[in-house]
A protein has these predicted regions:
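Active-site phosphate-binding strand-loop segment of PLP-dependent enzymes
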Residues: 30-99
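Hydrophobic residues in well-ordered beta-strands that form the structural core
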Residues: 4, 25, 85-86
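Conserved PLP-anchoring active-site segment centered on the Schiff-base-forming lysine
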Residues: 1-13
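Conserved core segment of the aminotransferase class I/II
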Residues: 114-182
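Short, solvent-exposed loop/turn segments at secondary-structure junctions
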Residues: 9-10, 57-60, 90-92, 96, ...
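A short helix->loop->beta-strand "cap" motif at the edges of active sites that frequently abuts
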Residues: 21, 79-82, 116
Length: 182
């Protein structure tokens, strides 16, 4: 079961419906700050959540998770051994601070500071104002990339999380990327 922290991108839930996968969801609006920990644990302690998905900032409400909330998510992801898929489609577009200078603070807030169980999803289409065809980047922590999971081995015939993600899942779903987006 995948847990969505909403509001988020509704197509992600639709993708799970198409694949026949289960998901649960809650709206973060009433669970900001320390309240987030208790809410997340109410789901995670059941033991059936394999991943947490959220957008930061999100569309359409533009709620931005704070560092403390990202720390809570990261620490609980480690404690309960779940993977965080952090959708950064609007990477560095929280204009309350200037995130536009590469390699200089301040940096894009991310759960990657607080856990090794992460996949960051970054939209190249939005970052480069590229309308039309879509292209993005997935960033997997080294630890998660090299980790083996019995379920993945059973379904895909072996490999680590990273190799299955790239060579089995991502390639099969995208068949590469369009020439113009490259």
């Amino acid at each position: 079961t995948i847990l969505f922290i909403d509001p988020g991108f509704p197509v992600q839930k639709q993708q799970l419906v198409v694949m026949g996968q289960k998901f649960e969801t809650f709206d973060v609006y009433d669970f900001r700050g320390d309240k987030l920990k208790e809410k997340l644990e109410s789901y995670l302690k059941k033991g059936n959540i394999s991943a947490i998905v959220y957008s930061n900032p999100n569309n359409p409400s533009w709620i931005c998770l704070k560092e403390e909330e990202l720390r809570i998510i990261g620490e609980l992801a480690t404690q309960y051994d779940v993977i965080v898929l952090e959708d950064l489609a609007y990477f560095a577009m929280d204009f309350r601070q200037d995130l536009s200078k590469p390699f200089q603070a301040p940096y894009q807030p991310s759960v990657a500071h607080y856990t090794d169980n992460y996949v960051l999803l970054i939209s190249g289409s939005k970052a480069f104002s590229y309308a039309g065809q879509r292209i993005g980047v997935s960033c997997i922590s080294n630890k998660l990339y090299h980790r083996s999971y019995p379920g993945l081995t059973k379904r895909y015939g072996g490999g680590t999380f990273g190799t299955v993600f790239i060579h089995r899942v991502l390639y099969a779903l995208s068949s590469g990327t369009s020439h113009s987006a490259q």
